[in-house]
């Protein structure tokens, strides 16, 4: 089946007298209501596309299937690409962790908890699986042909831990060598993975400075049994590093990394350092995809 993810590709496809079956993904097609008339769309699916009433009628009349977004849910049924940090953290301004609760990512998490992690209404469960399927599709498009190193676990590792620095240095070195770094997208060892990739275009001394800054915890929290990610300023410290060491467009393109977190563990904010975030509702699907991405090397940390 063809996958159409741009209006140029859609227009070329539409010029055929009988378009081949295609998945039309997350496109705004409201201006095409006239061109959609009298076409046959048997076998084609329109996923999360913006359509006017006339366009929808023409597609259904032509034998196509429309899967729209749910107006009662905050997330789309289908995405044609992975999330970015700016998208998930929209609404967060760099303050304490309570301020993170105003962002888009946490809005979805609250909705996730309200509907239930597992025993959900049928429509909600269906839309979650559709969303996760599109994340997997976008993930595989991104890693295709790449040399991948994946690191999972280790969410309890503190930023001041020597292993955090070692992982960041290794990740930076591998990223510069052309490997695509992938992690579970959470705190600890996973965050170190993305921090290393984040600084691949900068001198290592700057990364060392950043780690020294990001690892300073509030003194009252040092004896806490909860992980460092429970610190009220955990995210703010990382956000300050992003602000003080911004990445250029070329760095983002040349040194990408992918976080694969889940709303199932949504109490842990995702790391703000990867260029791409493949966030899932289903933890089992997320774990399965993390193990099946054919990584050249796979590392897992305890804790």
Language model features: what each stretch is:
Residues 161-162, 172-177:
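Glycine-rich phosphate/diphosphate-binding loop of Rossmann-like nucleotide-binding domains
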Residues 129-142, 286-288:
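Short, charged beta->alpha transition segments
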Residues 144, 148-157, 174:
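Active-site donor-nucleotide binding/catalytic segment of nucleotide-sugar enzymes
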């Amino acid at each position: 089946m063809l996958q159409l993810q741009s209006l140029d590709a859609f227009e070329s496809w539409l010029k055929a007298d009988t378009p081949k079956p295609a998945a039309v993904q997350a496109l705004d097609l409201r201006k095409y209501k006239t061109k959609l008339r009298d076409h046959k769309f048997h076998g084609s699916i329109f996923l999360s596309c913006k359509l006017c009433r006339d366009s929808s009628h023409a597609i259904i009349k032509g034998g196509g299937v429309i899967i729209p977004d749910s107006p009662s849910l905050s997330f789309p049924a289908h995405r044609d690409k992975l999330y970015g940090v700016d998208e998930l953290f929209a609404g967060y301004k760099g303050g304490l962790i309570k301020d993170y609760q105003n962002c888009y990512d946490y809005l979805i998490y609250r909705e996730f908890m309200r509907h239930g992690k597992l025993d959900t209404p049928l429509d909600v469960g269906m839309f979650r699986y559709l969303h996760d399927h599109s994340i997997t599709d976008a993930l595989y498009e991104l890693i295709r042909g790449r040399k991948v190193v994946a690191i999972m676990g280790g969410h309890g590792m503190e930023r001041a831990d020597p292993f955090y620095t070692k992982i960041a240095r290794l990740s930076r070195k591998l990223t510069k060598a052309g490997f695509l770094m992938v992690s579970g997208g959470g705190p600890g060892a996973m965050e170190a993975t993305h921090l290393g990739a984040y600084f691949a275009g900068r001198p290592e001394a700057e990364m060392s400075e950043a780690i020294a800054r990001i690892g300073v915890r509030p003194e009252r929290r040092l004896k806490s049994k909860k992980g460092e990610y429970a610190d009220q300023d955990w995210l703010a410290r990382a956000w300050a590093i992003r602000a003080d060491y911004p990445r250029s467009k070329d760095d983002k393109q040349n040194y990408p990394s992918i976080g694969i977190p889940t709303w199932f563990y949504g109490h842990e904010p995702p790391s703000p350092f990867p260029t791409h975030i493949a966030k899932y509702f289903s933890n089992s699907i997320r774990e399965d995809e993390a193990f099946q991405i054919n990584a050249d090397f796979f590392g897992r940390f305890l804790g």
